[in-house]
Amino acid sequence: MDRIKTFFRTSDWESVGVAAFYGYFAINILMKALAYDHGDNIYKFFFIFAMSFWAIKIVTTRYTLREIAWIAVLLALGLGLSVITKQNTWLLLFMTIIAMKNCRFEFMIQMAVYIRVFCLAMLVIGSTFGVFDIGYKTTPDSSYVEIPVYSFAMNEPNTAFLAVFLTLLLLLYYNYKKLNVWWFAGTSATALLFYKFTYCRTGIAVFFFVWALIIFEKIAKNRWKVVLALSVPVGAVFSLCTMLFYDGGNSVMRLLNHLVSGRIYIMSSYYKTQGVSLIPRAQELFYGQYYGLIDNTYMFVFLYCGAIVALFFPVSYTHLTLP
């Protein structure tokens, strides 16, 4: 008994908690990298382990009274959004932020890079050689000609390109100080190759937009870097305007909608049938008339979580990043 008491008194529980958090983080990255959804049984199985690691981190971390107050606010907001919208994204985000104390962000990014690169390579190579389902299908191009696309063992071709996009983005972030023309050439070639296989027009456009922001940040003087901070609210306003004022009879709007694979029509249809709300709404409201998946994060939050929650994030980001 004395040995047990001595063990608990002398053990570095803070380090144990940090290690547990890295385990929690790695499991979540792994499940997303393998394209598992929260409804999949294997995801639920590993989620139990992840939550156990998260609990260890919380009970072994010392928080100040102010931090505890913020934890209560974030958990209440996350749980409320989870219960009402039936989406756990915000709850997991807040839980991760809460448990990050004393953890090295650089190491977390490094883990995410290694896991993402390994899983993407495994899925692409495995599906190419027949180990996994390559997910062959056809889709109309800009001239409405059917072309072959592949999902590489993931749900959809767009999901496959998203996995590539996130992996490239992590690589760029992790090696940000080393970025040069060779990095641009290499990552662009990779993105264009998978664009050919997935025909994800929105994804490739966003990829080169990210590079445009990187180049701007590298060469712009400090007084012009306000543009980077404003990119988030500008993107939100643009998404909102296209959703509110979409008109299929307008040739410009019709072309823009076609270039983003019908996403504007999907958002506009939900807006016209369900309207907007200041507070979160139950997800079942959107099942009566299903128009498609809302994968524009700005409008997903706006329609599902309400205007108050949607405004909170771009305003907070802009306030924190303005020079």
Labelled PLM ranges:
Residues L77-L120, I215, S316:
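Transmembrane alpha-helical segments and their membrane-water interfaces
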Residues M1-A76, Y176-K177:
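Transmembrane signal-anchor hairpin modules in multi-pass inner-membrane enzymes, especially those
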Residues K218-R254:
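A membrane-periplasm/extracellular boundary helix in multi-pass inner-membrane enzymes
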Residues L34-F49, F132, V145-L166, C200, ...:
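Membrane-interface micro-motifs in multi-pass membrane enzymes
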Residues I264-G292, C305-L311:
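TM-adjacent membrane-interface loops and short helices in multi-pass inner/ER membrane proteins
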